[in-house]
Amino acid sequence: VISGALVVGFPVLLTLALAVDSNRPSIIMSEVVKASLHPASLLTAVVPDLYGVDGPLAEFWGPPSVKFGVTDLFLARNMGEVYMGALALAVLGATLYAFRRADRDMKYFLAFVVALVLYALGRYTPAFTLLYYVPGADLWRRPADATFPICALLAYVAGYGLHRLLAGEMRWRIAPTAAVLALLLVACWAMAEWKDQVARASMPILMACGFLAAAVTLLAWIVRSAPAPALTMALIGGFCALDFALGSGPNESTALPPSRFEMLRPNSTNETIRLLREKLAANTAPDHRDRMEFAALGFDWPNASLVHGFDQNLGYNPLRLSLFQRFTNADDLAGLPEQRRFSKAFPSYRSIAADLTGLRWIATGVPAEEIDRNLKPGDLNLVARTPDGYLYENPRAFPRVFIATSTLRADFDDILATGRWPDVDYRKTILLADASDEKPRRPGTAKIVSYRNAAIDIEADAP
């Protein structure tokens, strides 16, 4: 125990120290509940494509779409999927009543599933108010993410039930099982009728009827005939594969065309990536290491900077230092124009903050003026128009390293709150919270010798 505590203790302490200064030391409940799982989404455990998650977004009618009114939920539609397979559902319907006599371990898993469902439903049950105050719970931003372990645990419980059936340790009857499954299908049909979506939902419901009927038939034959284990496994695996391929097929969250992610390939031929590579490589000055930014290019683009080694100001859902968050007001994502937000201290691409951070290259999916309303003609240079969007240069971007020859006392909290920067030459002056009134030093030079993730070597001549 002592050895284990020593092994994990140090990284845990480092994590806690970082969390205190991060942009996510905790997430307030008013924001967390916006990612609750709507109770109507539980019906996808029976009919996976009930709401049209596999089709065009315009045809999706499940929560949180307009068909359910104002829900104040912010979830991707695939987050409402809780399908674990027709065979698993059939086994649960056949054996769940018998788990009152199950092993203690299996009762634990069932209790855990109940707790996770209550957590996933978020604002829709009073239980979440209590669960939120369990230590550590306020670190999680989406209750609906609990659907991942819910489906995994229910599949595990179903596997245990199938084991008990095949071992002759449980008995089941087809009629009650079929009745339970039929009742669930009726609930799905009623939901479609209520929302006037029978035309769209009828085919997914009929397909679910077919798979559930086949699952019950397969289960009955396996239990009665007791085929060889290899054949049993082959039948179960083949059926589940067919079920997930047809009943819960690829959607925009799991299987977009590979061509859409060309910019994420290390050897990408994407024109925007190619131009950025060339521009970044062309600046060989020893004091430069230009930063860049992807904005309004789409959901997937922020990750391209990681693939290609670009130094980007933004990112996708990053863990940031809270000071950087206050300085930039950067959101979790900048895939759309309105998601690229600015702050008082960093009010525009044409600003002291943009120059000081060395932000030289800006790739956007729309004209930069639609993202930054403060821009005026000539503030940025349009370098290229690519199939993806626009590439701009900020010609005023500072080098990554240089020697400041004077200091100036500054109130950083005031700069962050008001955006009022001291009127000085920032190529010569460094702002400090507690600066002394020393005479300016003679100019010097600085250059980057090496730049790695864990170590940066800078050579300076500061007379």
Task: Identify the role of each PLM range.
Residues 206-207, 310, 315-317, 334-335, ...:
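Flexible, solvent-exposed extracytoplasmic
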Residues 28-31, 229-320, 392:
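Extracytoplasmic
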Residues 256-271, 311-356:
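Luminal/periplasmic acceptor-recognition loop/helix of membrane-associated glycosyltransferases
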Residues 1-2, 102-107, 111-117, 121-269, ...:
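Contiguous transmembrane helix-bundle modules in multi-pass membrane proteins
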Residues 59-112, 165-172, 219-232, 373-375:
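Long hydrophobic segments that form regular secondary structure
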Residues 74-77, 90-99, 259, 267-281, ...:
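Short alpha-helical segments and helix-capping/turn motifs at coil-helix boundaries
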Residues 3-96, 132, 137-148, 193-205, ...:
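Periplasmic/ER-lumenal interhelical loops and adjacent helix-loop junctions
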